[in-house]
Amino acid sequence: MTESGSTASPLCGVGSSVMTETQETYQATTRVKRGLADMLKGGVIMDVVTPEQARIAEDAGASAVMALERVPADIRSQGGVARMSDPDLIEGIVNAVSIPVMAKARIGHFVEAQVLEALGVDFIDESEVLSPADYTHHINKWKFDVPFVCGATNLGEALRRITEGAAMIRSKGEAGTGDVSEAVRHLRTIRGDINRLRSLDEDELFVAAKEFQAPYDLVREVASTGKLPVVTFVAGGVATPADAALVRQMGAEGVFVGSGIFKSGNPAARAAAIVKAATLFDDPSVIADVSRGLGEAMVGINVSDVPAPHRLAERGW
């Protein structure tokens, strides 16, 4: 697999009555990838750094785990260049659990993505939590058989990542802070952008497509359906059962939890509580019950106290 070479997006020629064999193959692949992501809907995906943590997450009811060497809070506090995790660590986690395993690649680092695919992970997260490898290009995700997860702070970012082949979108939030406010803001922004599209006529949608730097057919589809064509999760700052219920009530189809579980006082109990809250998110009595006796939550940091150059959500374009 190489970086060079042209690979057309299946979005090309959507309106044509003649579909090439290549386009048919891409559309079939897209359905498979998005279908795999759709199976995680309603679930909680947890960051883990050891096979033992992965088993705790699985026992708590996690729908998938994210294998990495350092959780975002440690990446933030320790600094340095954050890269793809060691293959031995990833394989150890893959072999430890029966649920899907995700792993992170740096933005634009297509070779890290190739390695992760060779290791047999179930999803690749092209993640702003790691140090970007390319400040101009994201990975061409159509070249891979494994589905990709990508972050977004607004609809334009989400549409561009989908155009590149992402099968799942997550809000970026501000990872490693324990402050859910940015995740909430990004989710509201994406929903607000979609609502604005729905009020536009066809001519105005052409202008919107230019504004979002996304294909017109994709913009028109979102305007028609009122939602993204892929599953939308929330990530960044979810640390309590109430946080999980909050974003689920706001329309998130699932939750990523990074540092919030294994940086807390009782990881096993908190993991199970967040899973239950994400499932029964519209029942306040359940949220109250599962929030009892969990021990200390991660200390965290207010997003407003994070200097602009250190805000991970601003990585990507």
From Swiss-Prot:
Instruction: Identify the residues that bind D-ribose 5-phosphate.
Output: D47, G176, G237, G258, S259
Any Gene Ontology biological process? amino acid metabolic process
Per its record, the protein catalyses: aldehydo-D-ribose 5-phosphate + D-glyceraldehyde 3-phosphate + L-glutamine = pyridoxal 5'-phosphate + L-glutamate + phosphate + 3 H2O + H(+)
The record's annotation in Gene3D superfamilies points to:
Aldolase class I
Upregulating conditions: By indole.
Top-rank taxon, per record: Bacteria
Q: Name one GO molecular function term.
A: pyridoxal 5'-phosphate synthase (glutamine hydrolysing) activity
The record's keywords, sorted A to Z, are: Lyase, Pyridoxal phosphate, Schiff base
Known pathway: Cofactor biosynthesis; pyridoxal 5'-phosphate biosynthesis
Q: Which residues bind D-glyceraldehyde 3-phosphate?
A: R188
Q: Please give the function described in this protein's UniProt entry.
A: Catalyzes the formation of pyridoxal 5'-phosphate from ribose 5-phosphate (RBP), glyceraldehyde 3-phosphate (G3P) and ammonia. The ammonia is provided by the PdxT subunit. Can also use ribulose 5-phosphate and dihydroxyacetone phosphate as substrates, resulting from enzyme-catalyzed isomerization of RBP and G3P, respectively.
Q: What is this protein called?
A: Pyridoxal 5'-phosphate synthase subunit PdxS
Q: Which organism is it from?
A: Corynebacterium glutamicum (strain ATCC 13032 / DSM 20300 / JCM 1318 / BCRC 11384 / CCUG 27702 / LMG 3730 / NBRC 12168 / NCIMB 10025 / NRRL B-2784 / 534)
- Lineage start: Bacteria, Bacillati, Actinomycetota, Actinomycetes, Mycobacteriales
